[in-house]
UniProtKB/Swiss-Prot annotation:
Disulfide bond sites: none
Protein name: UPF0301 protein BMA1997
Stored PANTHER family: UNCHARACTERIZED PROTEIN YQGE (PTHR30327), UPF0301 PROTEIN YQGE (PTHR30327:SF1)
One cellular component term from this protein's GO annotations in UniProt: cytosol
Superkingdom to which the source organism belongs: Bacteria
InterPro entries linked: AlgH-like
Length: 192
């Protein structure tokens, strides 16, 4: 790709780890890409729940969560970068402006400020959200190189997979967007 205008933008795409993914951190994962530019990429793993639930996380940060259906929702491992920091992927909330939000091209938002969690705790925050600890990050050209080496498949993201599909089904559901299943994948790249 010789010109920056030729560069593909993978923002609002899923990265689906191929079977040959050597890094166990990302093996079997689906990553939602929040940002992809010439400077690099930032994404959140959406299918790795941790043993931490919202109730225990909110207690750790001195927030009282009293909304019963939310108490036992898992917090996810978002990636190996900044694992002590929370990242909330959510649908936009009309009339709200959180302190540290980024609108993802395509409609979702990613917020890193505590005010979004305060809003969730009081029932005024986003109704559909996914909270991760940590994120995945790639330097300039790094993700493109991993894709060219058959490390990832890409497909346009579907918010229903992020918010409505059980975590253990997200990998197959994301592959389904491409019309394939994991049984059809090979870790070997084809060569003519």
């Amino acid at each position: 790709m010789s010109k920056s205008s030729d560069r593909i933008n993978l923002t609002n795409q899923f990265l689906i780890a191929m079977p040959n993914m050597a890094d166990p951190t990302f093996s079997g994962t689906v990553v939602y890409l929040c940002d992809h530019s010439e400077r690099g990429a930032l994404g959140l793993v959406i299918n790795r729940p941790t043993d931490i639930d919202l109730e225990s996380l909110f207690n750790r940060i001195d927030l009282k969560l009293e909304i019963e259906p939310l108490l036992h929702i898992p917090v996810y491992f978002g990636g190996p970068v900044q694992t002590e920091r929370g990242f909330v992927l959510h649908e936009p909330v009309e009339g709200s402006a959180y302190n540290s939000s980024m609108t993802v091209e395509g409609g979702l938002e990613m917020t890193t400020s505590k005010d979004v969690l305060e809003a969730v705790a009081t029932g005024t925050g986003p109704k559909r959200f996914l909270l991760t600890l940590g994120h995945a990050g790639w330097g300039a050209g790094q993700l493109e190189e991993e894709i060219s080496k058959n490390g990832w498949l890409t497909v346009a993201a579907d918010p229903r997979i992020v918010f409505d599909t059980p975590a253990e089904e997200r990998f197959e559901a994301a592959l389904g967007l491409l019309g394939v299943s994991s049984s059809m994948l090979s870790g070997e790249a084809g060569h003519a």
